[in-house]
C-alpha cells in the first residue's frame, strides 16, 4: 500500500511548505488542502521561476497530480478564479485537475468587510489578520449560517440565504463599526458568475480519497499556516481560525487518521512570525536584521515584514506532541551562514526562577516567562545549494544533531535554498 503523507508547518507559518510539497509530489498522485483559505502563501521556485499559490494545492505544477480542496478550506471564489487564470496563462492545466468539496464554506465580500472593520476597530490590539475574510467565514460556518459551494447550484435558494445572512452582517457593519453596507445584488451576481465553473470541479472528496487509498495511490495533505497558529493549540487569541495541526486532515478532508503513514513537520532553522502575538525568542538587534534580510522574510500573502528570532525547542516539542511528527524538514539552514554563534531556546523561566519545558496555553502567559538559551558555535562556510549532508560544515551538522536531540525527532530533509533541487534528502517520507 502506498504512503499517505501530511506536510505541515510547526511554527507560526512561513516555514517553506510549498517548496517541500512540490519536491515530494514527484511520487504523489493526490495533493489535498484541508484547512485555511487564501491567507496561505506557498512559494515555489522551479528552475529559477517563482510561483506563489494561496489556495490551489502546490501539486498543481506536477502534471500527474490531482489537486483537491477539502471541506475544511474556506473558499473565496474571486481568489480561486484569479489563481486559476494566473496558472492557465502560464500553460498550467487547472480545471481538469482540480477538485473541490461542495461543503467548502464560501468567503464573500461581507466577510472581507467585517475582517477589515474589526482589525481597524482593535487599533493597537489588532491580531494581524490578512484582512481576507478568513475568520468571519469560519465564524459563519460554526454559527451554521454560512453559505457553501453547494449552495451556489440553486440560485433561488442561494439568494434567499444570502439575503438573510447579509442583513445580519450589514447591521453589524453599519450600526456597530460605522462602515458602509455590502451590496446584495453585487454580491449575488458575483457569486452566480462562478457557479457553473465551480460545479464542474465538485466531487465527493471523502469518497474520492477513499477510492484512491484503496487503489494504493499515494496521497499528500498540504497544511497551511503553522502549528503555533492553531485555533485550539496556538498562542490564542493571536491565532488563525482553523486547525492547522494534523487533526485537521480528518475533519477538513474526511480522511480517517489511521490511514496516515507519515507526518513531515516543516521547521525553519530559526523562527519567524508575522503580525502580533507572543514571540519569546524574538531578536530586535543586528542578528535579527541579518535573519530578516538574508532570509527574505516578507510574507508571501501580505508582503509584511516578518519578525525573526532564535530556534525555540520548547515550542517545537509541543508541535511534536500535538502532531505525532515522524520527521522534520529543516529549511533555510543557509540563512545562518556567517553567524559566529547560535542560540537555541531550551526552556522558559518564570518569575520565580523555575525553568519549564512546556509553553503557556494562552498568549498572556508568555508575558510571565523569559527564554533560557543554549549556545552553539556557528559556521562561516557557505551551505547554500548543498545537496549532500557530508558537504555541510561540521558546525552545521552539530546544530542539526542538537535539534534532533532536543525534539526527539530526526531531520529527514534539509533545505538549502528555494529551488526544489537545493535540498538534502536523508530519508524520503515515502521510504520511511
Curated annotation (Swiss-Prot):
One of its GO terms (cellular component) is cytoplasm. Its main location: cytoplasm. IMP binds at residues 14-17, 39-42, 130, 144, 225, 240, 304. Binds 1 Mg(2+) ion per subunit. Its cofactor is Mg(2+). Gene3D superfamilies: Adenylosuccinate Synthetase, subunit A, domain 1, Adenylosuccinate Synthetase, subunit A, domain 2, Adenylosuccinate Synthetase, subunit A, domain 3. The active site is at 14 (proton acceptor), 42 (proton donor). PROSITE patterns: ADENYLOSUCCIN_SYN_1, ADENYLOSUCCIN_SYN_2. GO terms for molecular function: adenylosuccinate synthase activity; GTP binding; magnesium ion binding. GO terms for biological process: 'de novo' AMP biosynthetic process; IMP metabolic process. Mg(2+) binds at residues 14, 41. Pfam families: Adenylsucc_synt. Its EC number is 6.3.4.4. GTP binds at residues 13-19, 41-43, 306, 332-334, 415-417. It catalyses: IMP + L-aspartate + GTP = N(6)-(1,2-dicarboxyethyl)-AMP + GDP + phosphate + 2 H(+). Keywords: Cytoplasm, GTP-binding, Ligase, Magnesium, Metal-binding, Nucleotide-binding, Purine biosynthesis. It is found in: Cytoplasm. SMART domains: Adenylsucc_synt. Homodimer. Belongs to the adenylosuccinate synthetase family. Plays an important role in the de novo pathway of purine nucleotide biosynthesis. Catalyzes the first committed step in the biosynthesis of AMP from IMP. This is Adenylosuccinate synthetase. The gene is purA.
